[in-house]
């Protein structure tokens, strides 16, 4: 069985894959020059718009932050950065795998693509663990529900992903062939076996382990929520039914967006080290390219999940009074013209002080209370 650099010898008929770098099989993948620019372009526009709106709510409308809102804020940041990394890839694939920019920019774009993808996965995991503790250990979750703990966890997540993705800057490079410059998604032939080993470690640490944690958390929560409460007669309360539906939706979105992408990418990389037929490799390569847009779509679906699953957050964002002018966030929002005028706020406060106090008391979470997603 041939392995290593020998696999890059020889040619067959077909269309060259920009990531293959002289690989012995030439894959038929003209479809990706339409699919990837179109899908990445849509994700870029929607992802930036939706996550920018979410960030505005977090920064300019919410007065009280806890662990849940902190994780959601960082999730929105990672999704927005992910969407912002797509325009150059749209241009690259629309030009037929031609990269007219520098090698350093190629490394940076690929690095940002995967860094923010895995940050999104880990922040979804943090939200799931936090919700699980709130359902299974509500008293203990009060201690860990403060924003200061969540900020430490968020910093650890960013540090972990940046450290794990740093080797990608070494592997990824560009090559010039036939007047075309390719920004590779893998590595040079002599480093490919090391790149596959690195990718498998990243798969285990940044996808498989978080996915297993999410499955366990939601299984435990579903079991607790489906348990009939003492003294109730038949059927689940409406709140519990909604929570169970939310669990199913989050799991479905996570599995739809991330699972196919990681499975096909792992098979694609692994099969290239084996002496398989080019037809088999072409099929798995096609599947891998098709699942790329699914992984990207998660940055558009996360903001929708915030508002579909968290009606309290929507009500809080709609009704809460903006922060006072003393806060840096409020000052920034005022400079951008995003806050209501001071005179309007003053008049509204004078005319409805009692009703405003009553409404704020109703919607502001108590200390340690979680905004459930």
UniProtKB/Swiss-Prot annotation:
Chief location of this protein within or outside the cell: membrane
Region (Disordered): 320-373
Matches recorded under PROSITE patterns: G_PROTEIN_RECEP_F1_1, G_PROTEIN_RECEP_F1_2
Extracellular topological intervals: 1-39, 92-108, 174-199, 265-373
Subcellular compartments: Cell membrane
UniProt topological domain (Cytoplasmic) ranges: 61-70, 130-152, 221-243
Disulfide-linked positions: 106-183
Record Gene3D superfamilies: Rhodopsin 7-helix transmembrane proteins
Coiled-coil annotated residue ranges, if any: none
Record carries keyword Transmembrane: yes
Induction: Up-regulated in stented coronary arteries (at protein level).
Entry's Gene Ontology cellular component terms: plasma membrane
Signal peptide extent: none
Swiss-Prot/TrEMBL keywords: Cell membrane, Disulfide bond, G-protein coupled receptor, Membrane, Receptor, Transducer, Transmembrane, Transmembrane helix
Similarity remark: Belongs to the G-protein coupled receptor 1 family.
Function according to Swiss-Prot or TrEMBL: Receptor for ATP and UTP coupled to G-proteins that activate a phosphatidylinositol-calcium second messenger system. The affinity range is UTP > ATP.
Protein name from the UniProt record: P2Y purinoceptor 2
């Amino acid at each position: 069985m041939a392995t290593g650099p020998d696999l890059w010898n020889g040619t067959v008929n077909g269309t060259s894959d920009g990531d293959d770098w002289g690989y012995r099989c030439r894959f038929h993948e003209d479809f990706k020059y339409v699919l990837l620019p179109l899908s990445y372009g849509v994700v870029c526009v929607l992802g930036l718009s939706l996550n920018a709106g979410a960030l505005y709510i977090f920064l300019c409308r919410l007065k009280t932050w806890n662990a849940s809102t902190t994780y959601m804020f960082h999730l929105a940041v990672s999704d927005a950065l992910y969407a912002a990394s797509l325009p150059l890839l749209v241009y690259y694939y629309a030009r037929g795998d031609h990269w007219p920019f520098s090698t350093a920019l190629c490394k940076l774009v690929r690095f940002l693509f995967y860094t923010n993808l895995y940050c999104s996965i880990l922040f979804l995991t943090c939200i799931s663990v936090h919700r699980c503790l709130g359902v299974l250990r509500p008293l203990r979750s009060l201690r860990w529900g403060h924003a200061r703990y969540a900020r430490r966890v968020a910093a650890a997540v960013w540090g972990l992903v940046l450290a794990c993705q740093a080797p990608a800057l070494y592997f990824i490079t560009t090559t010039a062939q036939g007047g075309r410059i390719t920004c590779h998604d893998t590595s040079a032939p002599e480093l490919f076996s090391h790149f596959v080993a690195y990718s498998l470690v990243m798969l285990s640490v940044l996808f498989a382990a978080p996915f297993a944690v999410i499955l366990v958390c939601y299984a435990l929560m579903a079991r607790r929520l489906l348990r009939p409460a003492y003294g109730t007669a038949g059927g689940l309360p409406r709140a519990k039914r909604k929570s169970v539906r939310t669990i199913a939706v989050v799991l479905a979105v996570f599995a739809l967006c991330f699972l196919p992408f990681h499975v096909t990418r792992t098979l694609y990389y692994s099969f290239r080290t084996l002496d398989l037929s080019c037809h088999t490799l072409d099929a798995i390569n096609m599947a891998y390219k098709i699942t790329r847009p699914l992984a990207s779509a998660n940055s558009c679906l996360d903001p929708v999940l915030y508002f579909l699953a968290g009606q309290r957050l929507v009500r809080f964002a709609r009704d809460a009074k903006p922060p006072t002018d003393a806060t840096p966030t409020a000052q920034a929002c005022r400079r951008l013209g995003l806050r209501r005028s001071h005179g309007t706020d003053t008049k509204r406060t004078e005319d409805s002080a009692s009703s405003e106090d009553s409404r704020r008391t109703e919607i502001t979470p108590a200390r340690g209370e979680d905004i459930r997603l």
